[in-house]
Amino acid sequence: MTTNKSYLTYFTDALWINNQPLIAILGICSALAVTTTVTTALTMGFAVSFVTGCSSFVVSLLRKITPESVRMIAQLIIISLFVILIDQFLKAFFFTISKTLSVFVGLIITNCIVMGRAESMARHVSPIPAFLDGLGSGLGYGWVLVCISIIRELFGFGTILGFRVIPEILYASAAHPDGYENLGLMVLAPSAFFLLGIMIWIVNIIRAPKTKR
């Protein structure tokens, strides 16, 4: 039972307590490009979770036989393998989304979260905790992207997951020039950084001890 709780802690801590984008401020560059819609954010979150979880598992599995002098090269090779797998999977079964994400799936190999979990956690613990930590870190990254993308897609396009949320009748037209208009700022990349900054601020307020408020 204690072991199970310990394993669960690796996962839950990565989701919230040690959330990589909000606490460590890692992996934030992709927030610019992949959060214009919820669909792309979900896909990137899934891809990073897969790569981080699987690569952490393999790095941990091979940690005792990997020479210290080449450990980072070995980690990059392992990460590259899973990046290629998820990239090919998306191209085969979700080609439209893969085309939308373009090179950003391949650039997961440069995501600081993936190498960070391999270097700081996976090579120090057994495979199961390493996998749970990697999976939790990926999902923690994913839910941050989804939160940002919901706001950007809703106010930038009036939709969520491609479904119309803001009725067409409310939009400005020749007959109703004072109607609603989408916020063009939300479609632009800087809006993601503003939203991420607000999320970090909110999380810091929630996490701050009551005595410091």
UniProtKB/Swiss-Prot annotation:
The chain crosses the membrane at residues 22-42, 43-63, 77-97, 101-121, 131-151, 183-203. Keywords: Cell inner membrane, Cell membrane, Ion transport, Membrane, NAD, Sodium, Sodium transport, Translocase, Transmembrane, Transmembrane helix, Transport, Ubiquinone. Its main location: membrane. GO terms for biological process: sodium ion transport. GO terms for molecular function: oxidoreductase activity, acting on NAD(P)H, quinone or similar compound as acceptor. It is an enzyme of class 7 (translocase). Pfam families: Rnf-Nqr. It is a multi-pass membrane protein. Its EC number is 7.2.1.1. InterPro entries: NqrD, NqrDE/RnfAE. GO terms for cellular component: plasma membrane. It is found in: Cell inner membrane. It catalyses: a ubiquinone + n Na(+)(in) + NADH + H(+) = a ubiquinol + n Na(+)(out) + NAD(+). The keyword Cell membrane applies. The keyword Lyase does not apply. Belongs to the NqrDE/RnfAE family. NCBIfam families: nqrD, PRK09292.1. PANTHER family: ELECTRON TRANSPORT COMPLEX PROTEIN RNFE, NA(+)-TRANSLOCATING NADH-QUINONE REDUCTASE SUBUNIT D. Composed of six subunits; NqrA, NqrB, NqrC, NqrD, NqrE and NqrF. NQR complex catalyzes the reduction of ubiquinone-1 to ubiquinol by two successive reactions, coupled with the transport of Na(+) ions from the cytoplasm to the periplasm. NqrA to NqrE are probably involved in the second step, the conversion of ubisemiquinone to ubiquinol. This is Na(+)-translocating NADH-quinone reductase subunit D.
